[in-house]
Amino acid sequence: MAKEELLEMRGQVVELLPNAMFRVKLENDHEILGHTAGKMRKNRIRVLVGDEVLVELTPYDLTKGRITYRFK
C-alpha cells in the first residue's frame, strides 16, 4: 500500500486554539486548522502567533493540516 501524496505549504500562525490546535493562514490566503506533528510535540517546539510554519495537507481534506516545521 503506497503512502498518499501530501501537499506541503508555507503559512503563518494567526491564532492559538485549545488542544494544541492553530489557525494557519497559507500563502494562497486560505485559512486552515493545524495541529503540531508528533516530533514537534516530543521535542517541545513552541509555536506562537506570527510564526512562519510548514504545513502538510492531504488531498482529501484541505481544511486541516499538520504543522511539521517552524521556520526560524
Curated annotation (Swiss-Prot):
GO terms for cellular component: cytosol. GO terms for molecular function: ribosome binding; rRNA binding; translation initiation factor activity. The gene is infA. Component of the 30S ribosomal translation pre-initiation complex which assembles on the 30S ribosome in the order IF-2 and IF-3, IF-1 and N-formylmethionyl-tRNA(fMet); mRNA recruitment can occur at any time during PIC assembly. It comes from the Bacteria. PANTHER family: TRANSLATION INITIATION FACTOR IF-1, CHLOROPLASTIC. This is Translation initiation factor IF-1. The keyword Cytoplasm applies. It holds the Pfam family eIF-1a. Residues 1-72 form the S1-like domain. It is found in: Cytoplasm.
